[in-house]
UniProtKB/Swiss-Prot annotation:
Its EC number is 2.5.1.61. It is found in: Cytoplasm, Cytosol. Binds 1 dipyrromethane group covalently. PANTHER family: PORPHOBILINOGEN DEAMINASE. GO terms for molecular function: hydroxymethylbilane synthase activity. Signal peptide: none annotated. It comes from Mus musculus. It catalyses: 4 porphobilinogen + H2O = hydroxymethylbilane + 4 NH4(+). This is Porphobilinogen deaminase. InterPro entries: HemC, Porphobilin_deaminase_cofac_BS, Porphobilin_deaminase_N, Porphobilinogen_deaminase_C, Porphobilinogen_deaminase_C_sf.
Amino acid sequence: MSGNGGAATTAEENGSKMRVIRVGTRKSQLARIQTDTVVAMLKALYPGIQFEIIAMSTTGDKILDTALSKIGEKSLFTKELENALEKNEVDLVVHSLKDVPTILPPGFTIGAICKRENPCDAVVFHPKFIGKTLETLPEKSAVGTSSLRRVAQLQRKFPHLEFKSIRGNLNTRLRKLDELQEFSAIVLAVAGLQRMGWQNRVGQILHPEECMYAVGQGALAVEVRAKDQDILDLVSVLHDPETLLRCIAERAFLRHLEGGCSVPVAVHTVMKDGQLYLTGGVWSLDGSDSMQETMQATIQVPVQQEDGPEDDPQLVGITARNIPRGAQLAAENLGISLASLLLNKGAKNILDVARQLNDVR
């Protein structure tokens, strides 16, 4: 094992030693399903390796009575997993990419971004409102979401609705919707509902024209120790080139804006005919003030290649030496350019006011 010298262990099976890779994950059912998906891909690629899943709770899992945007910490769903990586208790961890900050702590990197599923949001309705849409819900209906991004966009579009914070994992939120008479509907990520096998609960899909999605939404990320070359090589084959380039652009946009979950920032990316289109927007908390722009860059979706030099620096926390560097840099530059355009037009004022108001709410 190269890198920091620790990582994988071995196990006896049929008298022969098998290498064991320890995979860290959050404890929620959705997190376990996502991790099982990644492990299944790795097992198919490396049948001679055994994978052991180690589940743990994160700060975001434990603090359930406060909106995420109010907790005031960036690595809400990743810090404990990174601590386990640092202590060599696990060899890699699986995250929802949207939970991973655009700047990682020293010593860590995203070694793989898997093929993105539907990045859009969905509305799940209380049984008595099945067949409705957000537009046709009764006046002052309560819609549950813990996302400032969703509230800012949807409040502007559907002023007759009231948006209320709802926390907990998907199971908890659906139970609150169905059993309490508090919510007429809740807004969740399509990808999460699909992974849980709950597609039948999707009452309305919010397309980007109605509600742009979070940076990285719908994609899974594999985080590893940056110097653990062996594990980096092992997981890098999971990189999906199109997803990678879209997410580099999105993360570069967010990082350059200095955004996070405490301000409403949203994106939409499309790769078509050798062009990467990035739409990004910022909103005031109530959605009354907003700014959106679209830019594009010429980027062909590359096939994976032989690994480039080992000393290539990360881009927005991601290492992908098997994807052409030029394409990655073009995607990063697109995100930076779009953020710069918005900042030059006054987006910083919108974001600063949103942060201040969020702090005092």
